[in-house]
Amino acid sequence: MNGGQAHQRFGMQIPKFQSQSHHPHPAQQAHHHAHHNQASHSINHQHNFSSGALAAATPHFTPGPLQNGAHVNVDEDIDETMNEHWQQQLQLAAESRQASSPHYYARTVAQQTKGIQIAPSQPESQENGSGDRNGLVKSKPAPRQGWHALDFGGQGLRALATSLFHYTFLEKLYLNHNKLKTLPPAIGQLRKLTHLDLSSNDISELPEEIGMLTSLKQLLLFDNNIRTLPFEMGYLYRLEMLGIEGNPLNDVLKSQIIKEGTKALVRYLREEMPVHLPPPDRDWIILDETASSSNSPTEKITVLSHNALCDSSATPSHFGYTPSRVLSWEFRRELILSELRSHDSDIICLQEIDQGSYNGFFREQLAYNDYKGVYWPRGRAMGMQEEEAKSVDGCATFFKGSKFILLDKQMINFGQTAVRRPDAKGQDDIYNRLWQKDHIAVVIFLENRLTGSRFIVVNAHLYWDPAFKDVKLIQTAILMEEITKLSEKYAKFPPCTDKTAFRFSEAEVEYASGDQIPLFMCGDFNSAPGSAAYNLVAHGRLTESHPDLEKRLYGNLSRVGMTHPFKLKSAYNSIGELSFTNYTPDFKDILDYIWYTSNTLHVSALLGEVDKEYLQKVPGFPNFHFPSDHVALFAEFTVKGKKGKVVEADFGPQRN
């Protein structure tokens, strides 16, 4: 459907089936989904339709007499109380049984739209301010699609062509009054469906992939032979009407829907969902066999970054498809800890860790694995009562204590740093848009105890809202400015002599300039490849005329542009980036990165993709095996030859 107009164009012609790629939504939708009113008593909706024949594409296309047209009475012992839920069920079932003629719904719409002039559809706003913490810059807009519904009702179809499932733009699909015995698993590809009518067929079971249709609001299955429902239907958290009358449904499920309605049944299936088999381990992709070898003399360092999804953000309104026990912090934190321990990374950067979880769980647990930590909460924690401040999330960075010495630690509050700039005076947007956001970055400066190499490690979390792409860009610019200042300061740090336990360490390195110090910049940047924030980091400069600034006033950053001196690359750019780092029903894209300075470091191995077959039945994270809506990034690096003066190590008094 395009917009909210009462009547839409009805297209009688259907183009030949061909592969059609899925086009992402212009911007991530909000995870907040209010409980809507129950569905209308009528299923004669107005929308764009195509009802052309599928004879050439569908096997056994044989229009014929209707099947399963009669009402089936089962489970007479169940009290079918005439409450509002069951009244609506019976009314919709009666309407469905009257819709047995070929293309009934398409013809109905055609009659209703005769003589009505169609107003041009309004383009969707590209700056949608509503949403949750994981929104981001707009995706590429989808080409205009003139129709969004197909009506193959009353055609006597015995099978469905695979080509049908390439029409991923479909929002409504009518397959009622046919002779279908099964529904192909490929139905899970039609993830934009809001209405699916399979009434009056001979279907005995639904595939698990039905759970992928998380946009469904109406699923009509009247007069089939369905005895049970897959637990994956618990993912259908937007479903308002499940039409199940006329099926020999088992007593437990039927009792649920009769007494409490569709949403209660979906909730029951979700909460009773058994633990699925875990996916295969993500591949360890070796990019440099020589450097990654355990026998290699080169200095290696591993880095992991993960947005852990803090407890306060993991609400049922945001993640309605996730069982409550899986969404609980007690369950998810154990999964996170298990993954951190399994990778045993030298450096760990976590975002969205609240103070209570850092102090009361991760710092203590990871200490058993030789980790020391540095943590700062976001700015809002200042001024709060101690107990209240525990729920404020922030950034936690851990490092192996036996391998590194902590030389310095800093916190960058983007908003506060911006208002302290000399050029901030009179720049309203700094105060009205940027200062109000309390996002931060944590910076630590480390020295390798054995080699003397030093590293700057940045752990950042940027603002999410796609309507504030200028804010994300300026946050990135301020981050790069502050790292530049710190790196120059760190280049002048004296050699570390407090290494008595490692008297045979190599000589310390004195770096000639800040951009010669190896730098890792990890985090959730809430910015996709190609965005302004991404381009600033990757290319080192961005002009003052960039459209993402929208001519807003940010001092010299919007007057003369933005630059930084570092030669930064995304670790995963070596494989063309992952398919996604954030995975939910409405949004899949890349938000998280491990950036590194390519003049000082070389990426030698990476943790690969989540198994694609596993994802065919999983509409979104978190779930039983992935504790956050973000996936962890993990990479191995080698340190390139050091540049700068070498200062001899202090080995203490020597005996003759």
Swiss-Prot record:
Main location: cytoplasm
Binding site for Mg(2+): 352
Keywords of this entry: Activator, Cytoplasm, Exonuclease, Hydrolase, Leucine-rich repeat, Magnesium, Metal-binding, Nuclease, Nucleus, Repeat, Repressor, RNA-binding, Transcription, Transcription regulation
The UniProt record lists the keyword rRNA-binding: no
Ranges of compositional bias, category Polar residues: 116-131
Residue ranges with Basic residues bias: 22-38
Cellular component terms per the entry's GO annotation: CCR4-NOT core complex; Cdc73/Paf1 complex; P-body
GO terms for biological process, alphabetical: DNA replication; DNA replication checkpoint signaling; nuclear-transcribed mRNA poly(A) tail shortening; positive regulation of transcription elongation by RNA polymerase II; transcription elongation by RNA polymerase II; traversing start control point of mitotic cell cycle
Cystine residue pairs: none
PROSITE patterns, A to Z: LRR
Family: Belongs to the CCR4/nocturin family.
PANTHER family listed in its UniProt record: CARBON CATABOLITE REPRESSOR PROTEIN 4, POLY(A)-SPECIFIC RIBONUCLEASE
Protein name: CCR4-Not complex 3'-5'-exoribonuclease subunit Ccr4
Annotated source species: Aspergillus niger (strain ATCC MYA-4892 / CBS 513.88 / FGSC A1513)
Lineage: Eukaryota, Fungi, Dikarya, Ascomycota, Pezizomycotina
